Amino acid sequence: MAGALAGAGAAVVLVGRRKAELQSAAEIIRESGGQAVPVTADLSARERLPEIARRCQQPFGTVEILVNAAGVNLREPADKISFKSWDLTLNLNLAVPFFLAREFVSGMRKKGYGRIINIASLQSSRAFTNGLAYGASKAGVCQLTRAMAEAWSRDGIMCNAIAPGFFPTALTAPVFDDPQTERWAAEQTAVGRNGRLEDLGGITVFFAAPASNFITGQTLHIDGGFTAK
């Protein structure tokens, strides 16, 4: 997603906890002719979000496009979910996207242009085994996106969500590490395969661009037709 935005001309700030991975991703973008700067930070620390937002705006100025891609899925059985794991999941997946976005809204409002792209999930509308807390958080993302749109779209800030199907990421490693489960997931789609990371690039650029000027509060499933069946 970051690579697609950089390829479309955006100057990208990559934020996360894993310094080496961030630096590597930024270097790949720069080698391809794009602009990218890594910012190492723990987004789950809500009290530090104002500071993180300031750091994000130092390299290139006002943030006009925010992709809320941080997330966690602990895959715990319902009977084993603790208050701690529930709070961790709901905090990072649902609270942080709102409070981080709010840090950038004033700058977007002054520019008269802003794009907030949240990450929903198949579990926003489907119940999966050991996905109670994660599913609750991702269902919340869809309503959060609508509420953000209602609050900020009149200021030129469009708020939409992408709901990916099964893509090979750190969160879905348990699926892709098991050939049988990976095959099952592919068979649930209409196209007969799981997602490739490049499949997310086009919709990310579209939601970030002026082409989406009249689209807000929407959640679009990028799942190869998983939810169509």
Feature-to-residue mapping (PLM):
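Canonical Rossmann dinucleotide-binding motif of NAD(H)/NADP(H)-dependent dehydrogenases/reductases
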Residues: M1-V13
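Short, small/polar-rich loop/turn modules that mediate ligand/substrate recognition or access, typified
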Residues: V67, S153, M158, I215-G217
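Substrate-binding pocket helix/loop in short-chain dehydrogenase/reductase
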Residues: P77-A78, S82-L90, I116, A185
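Active-site helix of classical SDR
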Residues: A101, S137, T145
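Alpha-helical segment proximal to the catalytic Tyr-Lys
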Residues: S106, E150-R154, N213
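Residue(s) in the substrate-gating loop at a strand-loop-helix junction
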Residues: S121
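Short C-terminal tail/terminal secondary-structure segment
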Residues: R126, V205, T216-K229
